[in-house]
Amino acid sequence: MAKKGPKRHLKRLAAPVRWELPRKIHKFTVRPLPGAHPMSESLPLLLIVRDILKYADNAREAKKIIKMGKVLVDGRVRKEEKLPVGLMDVVSLPDANENYRVLFDRKGRIKLKPTENPDVKLCKIKNKTVIKGGHIQLNLHDGRNIVIKVSDPTKAEEDVYKTGDTLLISIPEQEIKAHIPFEVGKLAYITGGKHVGDFAKIVEIERRGIYPDIVTLENMDGEKFKTVKDYVFVVGDEEPIIKL
């Protein structure tokens, strides 16, 4: 039997649990295109305009708003209504003078929170690769790649960025404004698990080789808990480097 290509439909009952939308009013919803964020951790732009921000009554109106270039994501006009918008992305509507940052609430649901810093964004380093010339390419959580030029690839002191660290970058220019290392004592935002949406201090990092690293944290109530490194997004020292 021949291949039928990628899936194009998504039933509401099968939509990711992070999506806060009525499940039984209609049968289908918008399926996001493959992109910078996984479907389980992002929302298509159409749902943000129609269901979250309530700027449209139906899909047709939402598409029209998007196609007219009225919506910006990370400082760039986006005209694809199925574009996946995920964690830390900035959604802007210049005509309404409104800016929102995508975060998770205490139940793990995707929420848009008004932001006072729409020109910067926090990005987690997911991976690093060495490219031609010995320069370092940082692969960030939102699909971005930033190349760090090094004068001498043999000098380890020039390689200051590690996986798990966080960068504060300008958008859309991608200029690095600040670097927050993943280390004990840093403030972290929890992106998954039982404590999703919480802020907590890193107390201990347990390196486990081929197994996921375990991080011990302490929240603002003094409660200690453990989670995997993938769920830990460092955001500052005593306070987040930008308001979240």
Swiss-Prot record:
Residues 43-108 form the S4 RNA-binding domain. The keyword Nucleotide-binding does not apply. Keywords: Ribonucleoprotein, Ribosomal protein, RNA-binding, rRNA-binding. The keyword Ribonucleoprotein applies. Coiled coil: none annotated. InterPro entries: KOW, Rib_uL2_dom2, Ribosomal_eS4, Ribosomal_eS4_central_region, Ribosomal_eS4_central_sf, Ribosomal_eS4_KOW, Ribosomal_eS4_N, Ribosomal_eS4_N_CS. One of its GO terms (cellular component) is cytosolic small ribosomal subunit. GO terms for biological process: translation. GO terms for molecular function: RNA binding; rRNA binding; structural constituent of ribosome. Belongs to the eukaryotic ribosomal protein eS4 family. This is Small ribosomal subunit protein eS4. The lineage of its organism: Archaea, Methanobacteriati, Methanobacteriota, Methanomada group, Methanococci. The gene is rps4e.
